Amino acid sequence: MKITVIGPGAMGLLFGGKLAACADVTLIGSNAVNLKEINTNGVTIKRGDSSVTRKIPAYMAGTCNETADVILLFTKAYQIADVLTENKGLIGPDTMLLTLQNGAGHDRVMREFADSAHVLIGTTKQGSYRESASVIVNSGLGETVFGGAAAKGEPGPDKARLEELREIFENAGFPCSVSENIRFDVWNKLMINASSSVLSGVLQVPQGYIAEDSYAWSICEDLIREICAAAAGEGAIFAPEEQILRVREHLRNAPDGYTSIYADIKNGRKTEADFICGAVVRAAKEQGLSVPVQETILRLVHAMEGR
């Protein structure tokens, strides 16, 4: 299977590097200096005291036109439309598009480039950080889940192809499953990303602060309740009180942790808030629901991006 990974950052290199043991992998990026280092040195993945290096071809965006069986997206969520447009030569009639990015709503954009039977969404609990342009550390292990994003009544992906892809992930060292209700899995992860994670970014505090400060936690509870309400209309049913307990436990288990949206705001970078809180707001509006706290947090994030 030919798998093309767009976005050779920490996660893109992790998945591309490990999948290369079981598939024909190509990397696509936009930083010429980093791509040169990857082509020269290969991709090195470290885990504990062990490491493995694999040679994987890396190309500048728009310069590779070899049709892929699967395109795995690891860019920022707001870059999806641009990177797929720039690399449309990679997309054939049978190419499957798969995203494991944070947030929700990516499939709305991806479906501008492929039909419902070829758009996959998912989540992963793998973790990775970069030591250099071509060296990453696999910092967290966990399951990867993906499935078809087709709406009710639309044709979904070929189950045999999904199983083939799952087996490749498994053989590459990624615990993996195919979900029959992937939107539930996506909303389950969004429960943390669109509540405590985004709030830590707005307040510029570590995760533990939110769990212990009464004012911060009350805001977080409101965000969680609004997520549950919006998710229900998408067929993902959650008990708000259970989710409130789950999120608080998550924060207390990693009190000194900082989120990616915290880092983006701190360093003056554009965030993925439109695919996190924005996904909740869009889903709520389509159902005629009001989610004022999510809307306010989203506006605050954008206001801070403009500093």
Regions found by a protein language model. Give the residues of each.
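Internal alpha-helical scaffold of NAD(P)-dependent oxidoreductase catalytic cores
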Residues: 89-90, 112-118, 131-240
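Generic preference for hydrophobic
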Residues: 27, 58-60, 146
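NAD(P)-dependent Rossmann-like dehydrogenase/reductase catalytic/cofactor-binding core
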Residues: 170, 221-307
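Short, well-ordered alpha-helices that flank and scaffold nucleotide-derived cofactor binding pockets
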Residues: 17-21, 85-89, 112, 278, ...
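Rossmann-like NAD(P)(H) cofactor-binding subdomain of soluble oxidoreductases
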Residues: 50-135
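NAD(P)+-binding Rossmann beta1-loop-alpha1 motif at the extreme N-terminus of oxidoreductases
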Residues: 1-51
